[in-house]
């Protein structure tokens, strides 16, 4: 009888410890930067510490490369809803200059006016990091 009483609390304790240990393994969501392009906004996930710091520097007004440039993933909004596309976070870089073919408004990506596989809005300004 004593063995059963002891097993039950030990089993419960083991289950609680396992749950606590596993919850520590769950990764935190990456920050998401919101950019304003004229009167439209779009969002990009920041997946590396370097990109996160660069975005914070931009938000603070530092003089760093400011044009977000990345590969467009169509038919998947990701963090960029309500748009039907997002920027592949693994391809994101910030540039001082880019070619004109990837410049434009987020709505131009949406409607296919921007035909490049990359999006690099020259007038983009970071407005928040969440």
Mark where each language-model region is.
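Bacterial N-terminal signal peptides that target proteins for export
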Residues: 2-12
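Function-determining sites in protein domains
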Residues: 26-130
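C-terminal motif of bacterial Sec signal peptides marking the signal peptidase cleavage site
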Residues: 21-24
